[in-house]
Each structure stands twice: as structure tokens, then as C-alpha cells.
UniProtKB/Swiss-Prot annotation:
A GO biological-process term: terpenoid biosynthetic process
InterPro entries reported in the protein's UniProt record: Dxylulose-5-P_synthase, THDP-binding, Transketo_C/PFOR_II, Transketolase-like_Pyr-bd, Transketolase_BS, Transketolase_C, Transketolase_CS
Name of the protein in its database record: 1-deoxy-D-xylulose-5-phosphate synthase
A molecular function GO annotation: 1-deoxy-D-xylulose-5-phosphate synthase activity
Amino acid sequence: MTHMPETPLLDQVHYPSDLRKLEDRDLPQLAREVRDEMIDAVSRTGGHLGAGLGVVELTIAIHNVFDTPNDRLIFDVGHQCYPHKILTGRRDRIRTLRQEGGISGFTRRAESEYDPFGAAHSSTSISAGLGMAVAADLDKTDRRVIAVIGDGAMSAGMAYEALNNAGALDARLIVILNDNDMSIAPPTGAMSAYLARLASGRTYMGFRDLGKKLTAYLGKNVDRAITRAVEHARGYVTGGTMFEEMGFYHIGPIDGHSFDHLLPVLRNVRDNAQGPVLIHVVTQKGKGYAPAEAAADKYHGVNKFDVITGAQAKVKPNAPSYTSVFADALVQEATFDDKIVGITAAMPSGTGLDKLQEVFPKRCFDVGIAEQHAVTFAAGLAAEGFKPFAALYSTFLQRAYDQVVHDVAIQGLPVRFPIDRAGFVGADGPTHAGSFDTTFLATLPGFVVMAAADEAELKHMVRTAAAYDLGPISFRYPRGEGVGIEMPERGQILEIGKGRIVKQGSKVALLSFGTRLADSLAAAEDLDAAGLPTTVADARFAKPLDHDLIRQLASHHEVLITIEEGSVGGFGSQVMQFLASEGLLDNGLKIRTLVMPDIWVEQAKPEVMNAMAGLDRAGIVQTVFKALGRSLIVGAAG
């Protein structure tokens, strides 16, 4: 049995107000105890470990110096928010992290007043923080706003748009750049700490503000001269940076694991800053836990693990994951076609494109957290005759919708979109669910929209996409493992807009789009047993629809049910539109569309989410019985 860590000091800290009562000399011990608590909690639930371990001292220092929740603290993405949750009244629930009915793995406004802005997608914190800082100025309050953003998230254009706007507005915004990959510049010991304290002190910050006041008083003619004077003085202390060019007062880099470095700088900024300030803090992912320090990439997101050894619990899969099937199929197709290239937005491992990178390093591109750029970059490649596969999670494709419409679809460019994590994703909840891709892609003229029913179908769709050059094409597939069917040596090229009948019946028709096919077949067994001979069809395409297949199903069955793991407005709506336009609803056809519910579905296991949505075997059977006006016999649904 695993024992709970001993945390005598942390036991006294329920909220940041308790933390502020501690002496500075007590904070290193508190940091050790927070780390122990976090490691133990995540070992039981799984979650994002490395990022949170890297910001323990920083989180404690911020809550110690600033008056949260009155002062607003925003974490970008949210992977690093676990220490924050422990210190803000949620320690008693930290072992429910990412579990059904438990607390979120990200910041959530509905969860705590200490979470002023929700996060899960990258690079939003500075924009949100700027909005809050401007609101504080308009309200004439002295409320401070702190945005903590990692160096990875700073690769997205949105972060720079916000920095540029904040500098132009001269907003009272504090941005803390958490450089946990040493990717910008390392701190240089005692001298770096001294210079950071000096630069954040009253004298130098006052000189900067004096320069701004003189500019306002004397006019724009002297603006350039005063700016040069301020930069000259600052250059002796820290040197100029691009952040200074954008209007930010830049401090650092400083050691993000040293309270002796963090506290003086944060207090100076709290007491003296008037305009936008950027503090560059260098941290180490996984700090304080040896296995995570040694392999940061393996401890970013973890399963349950043994605290002593660091060994993660891994369930042996019954079938290959959809991601790995896609990756292997793409590598296979790339060996036959040297025009195939892969594009990922900072997710090479998550999308499986790391396999393509290993085999064809010059034909695989990681563009950083920049989905908008990724899509238009792919469009440029397609315009020159290449076959780009822009592999994105469904939830992140949302960030690039204008580029999909304007740069790809309107021009009819043959960009291929492998859409991973389609449907429910489990512990990451509504922010990462792949709900909307079918809906927003199937509305676009000339777009081919597919969904794989199983891993063999996915292999067919990779080859089909590689062969299709008439316009944009997408294929969606879920997180997790396949159903364990026999795999073809190589995928087949599917006929565009043609589905297939998998099982023939006569009274009920189940038309599945995507991986709900397995549950549809299981439901058909129960319906057959109840005297309702059931046809099961795999649509394959939401656009173009298989009109002949839909006419056949509608004309020869009493009940037609569409099933998809997607939002309202998707495949089922496309089918309904066609049926209505063809007059196929005029003769008493009973049609029902099963989709993800029109709510934000909270975290749970995917199978629980599908059951709640009525997308599982039992839910499909129940929908058929209701459509027929019959009572469901107990046990009829398996």
C-alpha cells in the first residue's frame, strides 16, 4: 500500500492567504512538500507531471507576492496548474484529477475563483490577461494581472499579437515567460540574479516611466531620442531584447527554482511596474523527481506510475492504436510516392508523424504550435504539386478554420487532413474532445469528408487520400486502440462517396459514420433477436454522401438511425437534408440521428461518455425501440 507523503507545512496552507503568513525561509520546505503531494497524486490518477513539477517555486512565489484571487493569475495551456490547485483550496480533491466527477486537469472558471480564465489550448494567456488588465484600468482598480506562459506556447502567433497590442496600449500586465527548455537563454548565476533585481527596482523602472512622461509632455519629436537614452541605460544592465522592442520592460533570465531570485524580482515588479513587464524565468521540467528530470519527454503526460521506480502502468493493447495505424500507412504510402510530405503543429509523437520523420526527415515538418500556419503552409505545398498530410487533432484543427476555408477549400487545393482524437477523448474533457470537425468541414463545397470505422478502413483512407488530387480531403479517427480486425498488406483506394453494407436486414437500418460501427453491429444482434431484422451500413463519407445507399436504406426499411461520434449538425444533418430534398421523409420513414449531446461533456472514460450520449450498443437499441413505439424488453440490449 502506498503511503501518503508527510507534509506538515503544507497541511497549514489551505489557501494563498495562509501561504502569505509563512516566512520566506519556510518556502523551500513548502516547495518540497507540494512536489511530494503532486507526485503522489499524479501517480494515482495519471496526468501532466513534468510541467507542474517545474513551476512549484514559481507558483508559490506568485501566490506569496500577489493578492490572488483579487490579482488575476492566468496559466497558459494549464498543464502546469497542479501546484496552483493544491495551494488554492483543492488539495482535498487533487486525487480526483481528470477522473469522472473530479477536478479538471486544466484551469476552469467554474471550479475556483482562483482560476480567472480557463485554458487547455495553447497561447491564449497573454490575450486574456491583456483584456483583464485593460478592464482593471477602466474600472480604476489597482488589480494586477499575471500571465504565465511557456516557451513552447510562445511559438504561436497569437502570443505575439497579444504582446504587440499590450505594448501599444502600455497596459499594466505582467507576463512571466517560463523557459523550461533553456531555449532562449540560460541564467548566469549570481550576476544574473543581481542584474534582474537591479532592472526590476525603482531606479531603472522609474527612469523608463520618466522617459514616457517626457515623451508625452515634449511631443513625438523627442520620442526617438528619449527611447534611445532609456535603451542605452537598460543595455548596461540586461541588454536589449525583442520584448523591449514590443514595448515590454524585460527582466531576466532568472532562476525559477530559487526563491532568493524570484521573490525580490516579483516584489519589485509588484511595487514599481506601471506598464507591461515580461519576466524571463528559467525552470526545469520534472524538477525534484529524478525519473522526470532524466526523461522529460516521457513524463510530460503520464499514466499511473510507481513513485519509487517511476515505472508507468501500461495496459497491453488488444490491437494497434489508430494513431500508429495511420503513421505506418503514411510511411508505406510515402515509400511509393515521393511527393507525400507530413506536417504537424508541435505534435510529432501525438500524431504519429515522428515515424515519418525517422524514415523521411526532409519530408516531415514540425511547424510549432501554429495550426494556422500549418494549414496554409500545406496549401502552398499542394499548390506546387506536393501531397501534404496536415495531421492535427480535431480540437486543434478548430484553430485554423479560416485557413481551411480561405486558403485550401476555396482554391480547391488537395491538402490531406488526417484528423486524430476525433470524438470523445476521456480525461481531457470538453476542451480536447473532437466534436465539431465533421460539422464544420462538411459545410464546405468541394471538401471530401471521411471517417474510419476500424483500423483497416483507416489504412484504406490513407491510401485514398494519397491518391486523391481533385481537392481537399479529410479522414477522422479516434484516440485509442482499434477493434482488432485483420489488416490488409496495403490500403485500397476507395471510390469517393460510396459506403458499404456490412450486414443485411429488412426492418431497421443503422447507418454508422466512423467507429460507432462496432456498437451498431452489436446492437443489430440484439435487434435481430427481438424480431427486428437489421441492416448495418458503414457510410465512410459524410461528403459526398452515398445517395444510392441512403435511398436504398430509406426505401426498404421502416426505421433509419444515423450514428456518429460528432456534434449536432454533422453527418446526420447531411443525411436529413438529403432525405428531405428527395422527398424520402414523406412516406412515414422513422428516422433518428444519434450524435454527441449538445452540451460540454465533462471528463470520464470514453466508453462512459458514449453510453451517456446513447451512442453505445444499449443506446442504439433503445433508440430503435422508441422510434417504433415499443417498450424495451429487459436484457434485450445485451
